[in-house]
């Protein structure tokens, strides 16, 4: 017997809804040709987000690249030189920024990274003027020093000197006048260590509108703790709702009544992780978990899970689900699904497709479910203490 297709449609709908709630984070990235803008973007977001194909022109000098499955978009100036060309770009950008500000938040520009290559060893007056005029558009502008030589945790003195010179200008940048020193690509001969990426992510999250912070956290690929916090909020909400569903004990045969709550949780967890995997594959992955238990419906799956893990549950016909059991099973499912998503965000598209089509997805889910069930009291206390 095949799995009831209705829940798959529900998951797709809920996942689309959760992604829509998260929205989209848009970054404008500026800098001379060759400063490493694309490398920096792709290091933070872990995918070919920045100009690797054809973008959508928004001005003569600027294109917009939106990832088809990650909640991020990049406005990229095509590499400018200072002087008259820079002035022209600024005029066109100002018009475009103002126009977008009148529309939906997902279409607006939320922050600017102005990238300066550390190897240039100078920051010109025209560059300072460009930054000042960008900030006058009422956008948070962050100066990013790129390709910074780092070895054994020590930054090259020339990069430190350039950063100090930029800071001394007191430009209206955020979160302060000091540039953020980064290296986004390892080169064993020149810059053998990454640096500054977490600092850039933290600074960007600090200065952007709160309404798009969830999109930034979902899209980025370097800080899993941010994703975990967001996913745990979804689990906490679902465990509370599940307990409410069973405030009056629910016959175990009616366990499917819990699934709308849990379905929403699963969708919210995947959205929080920003998994760049087609949602149809996520549906198939959870379907394989259910089918592997021998169940043909979600109700039977939940009932079987409760009978298996809850002491004294006995048989499907002789047990009722109380609030504590409902919230604990929901919590364990949430952590099991977190484990699957956490594996996915570390994978390439090819690795993710292979993982979702294998027993590995079921094994990861079940192992994390068992661990969460064993430690359910501790985990429940932890998610209650996590800040909103």
Model-inferred region functions:
Residues 69, 91-176:
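Conserved C-terminal guanine-recognition region of P-loop GTPase G domains, centered on the G4
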Residues 42, 167-168, 270, 307:
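Residue-level preference for well-ordered alpha-helical positions
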Residues 48, 82-85, 120-123, 152-153, ...:
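Conserved protein kinase catalytic core
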Residues 1-84, 267, 273-276, 329, ...:
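Conserved G1/Walker A P-loop phosphate-binding module
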Residues 2-4, 9, 139-142, 147-214:
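Canonical P-loop GTPase G-domain recognition
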Residues 190-201, 206, 210-388:
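Alpha-helical membrane association modules
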């Amino acid at each position: 017997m095949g799995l009831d297709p209705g829940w798959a449609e529900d998951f797709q709908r809920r996942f689309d809804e959760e992604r829509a709630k998260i929205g989209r984070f848009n970054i404008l990235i500026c800098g001379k040709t060759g400063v490493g803008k694309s490398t920096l973007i792709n290091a933070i977001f872990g995918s070919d987000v920045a100009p690797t194909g054809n973008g959508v022109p928004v001005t003569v000098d600027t294109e917009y690249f939106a990832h088809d499955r990650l909640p991020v978009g990049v406005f990229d100036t095509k590499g400018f030189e200072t002087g008259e060309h820079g002035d022209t770009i600024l005029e066109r950008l100002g018009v475009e920024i103002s126009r977008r500000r009148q529309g939906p938040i997902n279409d607006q520009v939320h922050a600017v990274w102005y990238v300066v290559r550390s190897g240039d060893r100078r920051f010109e007056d025209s560059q300072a003027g460009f930054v000042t005029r960008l900030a006058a558009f009422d956008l948070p502008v962050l100066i990013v020093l790129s390709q910074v030589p780092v070895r054994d945790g020590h930054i090259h003195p020339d990069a430190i000197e350039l950063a100090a010179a930029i800071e001394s200008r007191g430009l209206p940048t955020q979160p302060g006048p000091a540039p953020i020193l980064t290296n986004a690509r390892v080169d064993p001969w020149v810059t053998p260590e990454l640096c500054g990426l977490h600092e850039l992510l933290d600074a960007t999250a600090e200065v952007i509108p709160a309404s798009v912070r969830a999109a930034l956290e979902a899209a980025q690929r370097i800080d899993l703790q941010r994703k975990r916090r967001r996913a745990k909020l979804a689990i906490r909400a679902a465990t509370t709702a599940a307990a409410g569903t069973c405030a009056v004990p629910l016959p175990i045969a009616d366990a499917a009544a819990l699934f709308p709550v849990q379905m929403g949780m699963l969708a919210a967890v995947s959205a929080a992780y920003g998994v760049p995997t087609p949602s149809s594959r996520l549906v198939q992955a959870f379907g394989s978990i259910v089918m592997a238990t021998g169940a043909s419906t979600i109700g039977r799956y939940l009932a079987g899970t409760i009978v298996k893990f809850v002491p004294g549950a006995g048989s499907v016909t002789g047990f009722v689900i109380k609030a504590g059991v409902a919230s604990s099973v929901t919590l364990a499912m949430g952590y099991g699904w977190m484990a699957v998503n956490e594996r996915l965000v570390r994978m390439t598209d090819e690795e993710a497709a292979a993982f979702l089509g294998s027993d590995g997805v079921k094994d990861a889910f079940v192992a994390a479910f068992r661990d969460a069930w064993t430690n359910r009291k501790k985990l429940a206390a932890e998610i209650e203490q996590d800040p909103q």
